[in-house]
Amino acid sequence: MAKAGANAREIVYPQISVTGLGDYDRNSGYTQGTVDFTWKSTEYNYDRGAKLSVDVMDNQETYNLAFGMAGAELMRTKVAPEADAFTFATLAGIAGISKGEAKTISTAEAFLAELLEAKNTMDNDEVPEEGRILYATSNLLNALVMMDSYKSKEILAAFTVKKPVPQGRFYTSIDLLDGKSAGEEAGHYRKGTAKYEKTKDVAPVSGKTYYTEDGGVYTPVDGSSASSGSMSSYYEMVTAEAKEINFMIIHKPAIIKHDKHIVSNIIPADSNPDADADIIKYRKYGLVDVYKNKVAGIYLSHKA
């Protein structure tokens, strides 16, 4: 259960915890327990949209196919993939979720072993088995299906839903392109790139890695060889480049996924004041997050 927060950009949801059982005394009776009920807040973190125009003559000359196909193509190749990629990347970045060892999984046997490890972790964390969804790359999931063994069938049966995910939607972080800046005019998203900030160190720290920047290219410099007179030009990596995800297990009740506003409409050419063109508009405003007391409901395995 969630409700509007103190401002329009957030929602709040209840979180409750109780103390456990104590010894019962035949004279004084029950041990007094406590109930802690609090409201937690989370802000909307996704606000994206696009406007496509198709000239009336272009549409006519394609037998009225161009306009309809443009809308369908937007949803199939841009909206749906970005929504998936944003969801997985956001969940992968949540602090406190369970993670396997970073490695490349190349065989069905290795995948089976990693899934058993993930299942053990979630079982020991007392995550309910019902409602667990397995998302994995198509290669891994299909390899496990083709394995067709007792063990592979048993592990797959442990998940309520099994869904293959294209690798292009399966990263630990993504960059949402703004559609305006140089190099981002096409919009959409890309695999998350490393992020850098100017160092705050006033002197080199031995063993620490700094970076110099030239035309957007960052070159590492070991702290032992960094120049104290050049500290103002050094950067530090604050976010590493995204990793490819092997698989993710999501206990559905653990996540908050809410689309507050979705609009998809058409403005005909005769209502367009700027051009003789039909317009398709699409906007989505929502959030993806995890309940603070249910982070164990997310298990992540990614490549090194």
Model segments located where?
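Short, glycine/acidic-enriched capping/hinge loops at junctions between secondary-structure elements
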Residues: 22-28, 293
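Sequence/fold signature of self-assembling virion shell proteins
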Residues: 4-19, 40-45, 62, 106, ...
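Active-site-surrounding "flap" and adjacent substrate/cofactor-binding loops of secreted or lumenal enzymes
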Residues: 28-31, 35-36
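Glycine-centered small-residue hotspots that permit tight backbone geometry or close packing
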Residues: 26-28, 126, 170-176
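Long, contiguous amphipathic alpha-helices that act as assembly "spine/axial" helices in icosahedral shell
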Residues: 13, 37-100, 123-138, 265-290
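Short, hydrophobic/aromatic alpha-helical segments in well-folded domains
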Residues: 74, 114-121, 283, 296
